[in-house]
Regions:
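Preference for long, amphipathic alpha-helical scaffolds in soluble/luminal domains
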Residues: 1-273
Length: 273
């Protein structure tokens, strides 16, 4: 999370600012620690109740760092994404993970977030091609159409699979049984909602406004009188929970940096990041 914070701060600091060098060095240090601590399966650690969320935050932190201009090991990023995306079953439309504590929401949000940038990149490429007359106005996102635009076949397959996954997951956003998570709200639920918010901004389309309204209504009902939110299981810290809720409700304010993540997936192969 520190890496994500610093990645947001660095682009806003002019190089003449006294803090720029300190933030830049701290970001480099965090990025090195994160990349060096990844396990071979693409996850991080296992020292938490729902490790799938821990690994999801690690995966998205790599994306934030790349968007901030840092050189990210493409193998590490691809491994992190694949680990999370593998928790979604395309045949059943369900999500599960050994380290999700048996809660589908956590695996769902992590897999959705891991695929979101590639899904958004696929959408971006197809929409721009239609606007420029390269593809017909009714063209859909397919491997063949992506290859027509110059994307090599392996990358076209990756982008399309992520796009198809995210489109399938959109159908689950009204599933209250899924969204209820553990059954009452802990920091894990708020973090999952935040991951979905980022996913919807990344992948583009019309789903974000509807989701934002749903979350505004949901969070207003459980906000404490002092303006904070607190968890009722596991992660109970009002500081953590309130921060996650605020980011859940304001993900679109990070749209410029999130779009930078899209642009990288739309223009280069992961190993060249």
């Amino acid at each position: 999370m520190t890496l994500q914070f610093l990645s947001r701060v660095l682009p806003k600091l002019p190089k003449s600012d006294p803090l720029h060098q300190q933030v830049n060095q701290a970001l480099d240090k965090c990025l090195a620690k994160l990349q060096n601590s990844q396990q071979q399966d693409g996850s991080w650690g296992g020292g938490s109740w729902a490790g799938v969320l821990q690994s999801s935050v690690g995966c998205s932190a790599l994306e934030w760092a790349a968007a901030a201009g840092k050189t990210v090991d493409g193998t590490v990023l691809a491994r992190a994404r694949d680990h999370q995306k593998g928790n979604f079953n395309a045949e059943t439309g369900r999500s599960s993970a050994p380290d999700s504590a048996g809660i589908e929401l956590y695996a769902f949000a992590g897999s959705q977030r891991a695929a979101a940038s590639e899904a958004g990149a696929a959408r971006q490429l197809i929409e721009e091609a239609k606007e420029n007359g390269i593809l017909p106005a009714d063209a859909s996102c397919t491997v063949e159409n992506l290859m027509t635009l110059g994307v090599d076949k392996p990358q076209a397959n990756t982008l399309y699979k992520s796009y198809a996954q995210n489109m399938a997951q959109l159908e689950q956003l009204d599933n209250e049984q899924l969204l209820s998570g553990f059954g009452n709200n802990g920091g894990e639920e708020f973090l999952s909602y935040m991951l979905t918010s980022e996913s919807l901004v990344l992948q583009g389309g019309n789903a974000w406004p509807k989701w934002k309204q749903k979350m505004n209504t949901r969070m207003a009902k459980i906000q404490i009188a002092n303006g904070s939110w607190t968890g009722h299981h596991c992660i109970t810290s009002p500081v953590f929970c309130t921060a996650a809720v605020i980011q859940c409700l304001t993900a679109d304010r990070d749209e410029v940096l999130l779009r930078a993540i899209n642009n990288q997936d739309a223009s280069v192969k992961p190993e060249r990041l």
